[in-house]
């Protein structure tokens, strides 16, 4: 992928949780790099083998950057756009006018799986349960799981904090149903498949997991299902055994295992895992290319 030399700003750099590391591995052609955040000025972040001091977002001159990746603080997007800076919105929030959005990993994961099911037969509806690694919440999620785990083993009081509604260490914390329902509604409309979705945070640093079941209007065979999943781009169907979130780390493929069809052929289920940080970085890179090409 060919790109010009970039003056790149990353907003919310302390929320990156592996994104900066993965982006640096892609060796973007950079003329300048500006890590930006609020209230973290002077802290250091690692990028491209070097440590960079975090700059205060409020004081930044947007005319010095060609393109900005927003991981947080999207209220500053308008200022960046007004200064002529291209913007990639990787915050996972509501789409911002003028910015190129990065789709949430859970949306991409579900889209690939439902695409495979639709290739196998007439999908009437689907039900899924997603288990989200703490890196979904950026560095704050990773730090909170680490802190709470240490406190438990040291028999100290565990501070819940604000990142999660309840303790995350050795626990499973459901995502607010309104948020999960909003994702399901948006995906159902896009893919034309009614979808019921539950999401939960789990005490895993990296790697999202998803259990999904689809109901068909007519019977499908195991062979048809296997062919559909094998032929769907972005999916690696494990020939045997079970895929864990750890197996997917380092790649952008959705690993699928435990593919099964009911006796009547009218329903099928699958287990899927993906490296959320790696896939987010690659999706961000694609959005970055789109932003640079946009006029």
PLM regions: where:
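N-terminal Rossmann-like NAD(P) cofactor-binding subdomain of oxidoreductases
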Residues: 2-166, 192-194, 218, 222, ...
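Contiguous C-terminal substrate-recognition/catalytic subdomains in enzyme active sites
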Residues: 61, 159-249
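A structural motif
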Residues: 128, 212-213, 284
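Hydrophobic side chains in beta-strands
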Residues: 130, 174, 214, 258-259, ...
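Glycine-rich phosphate/pyrophosphate-binding beta-alpha loops
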Residues: 201-203, 274-278
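A generic structural signal for beta-strand entry/edge sites
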Residues: 209, 265-267
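Short, well-ordered beta-strand elements
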Residues: 268-274
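Flexible, small-/acidic-enriched active-site or ligand-binding loops
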Residues: 276-282, 286-292
């Amino acid at each position: 992928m060919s790109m010009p030399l970039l003056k790149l700003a990353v907003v919310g750099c302390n929320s990156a949780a592996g994104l900066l590391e993965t982006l640096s591995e892609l060796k973007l052609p950079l003329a300048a790099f500006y890590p930006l955040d609020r209230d973290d000025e002077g802290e250091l972040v690692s990028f491209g083998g070097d440590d960079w001091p975090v700059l205060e977002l409020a004081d930044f001159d947007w005319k010095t950057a060609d393109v900005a990746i927003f991981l947080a603080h999207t209220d500053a997007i308008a200022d960046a756009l007004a200064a002529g800076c291209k913007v990639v919105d990787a915050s996972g929030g509501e789409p911002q006018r003028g910015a190129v959005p990065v789709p949430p990993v859970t949306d991409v994961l579900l889209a690939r799986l439902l695409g495979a099911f639709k290739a196998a037969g007439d999908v009437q509806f689907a039900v899924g349960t997603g288990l989200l690694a703490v890196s979904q919440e950026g560095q704050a999620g990773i730090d909170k799981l680490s802190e709470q785990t240490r406190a438990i083993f040291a028999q100290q009081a565990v501070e819940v904090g604000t990142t999660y509604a309840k303790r995350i260490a050795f626990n499973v914390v459901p995502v607010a149903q309104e948020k999960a329902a909003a994702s399901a509604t948006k995906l159902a409309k896009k893919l034309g498949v009614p979808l019921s979705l539950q999401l939960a945070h789990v005490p895993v640093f990296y790697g999202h997991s998803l259990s999904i079941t689809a109901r068909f209007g007519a019977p499908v065979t195991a062979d048809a299902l296997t062919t559909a999943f094998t032929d769907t781009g972005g999916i690696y169907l494990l020939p045997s055994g079970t895929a864990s979130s750890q197996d997917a780390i380092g790649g952008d493929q959705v690993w699928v295992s435990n593919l099964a069809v009911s006796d009547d052929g009218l329903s099928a289920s699958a287990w899927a895992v993906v490296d959320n940080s790696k896939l987010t970085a690659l999706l961000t890179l694609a959005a970055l290319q789109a932003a640079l090409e946009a006029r």
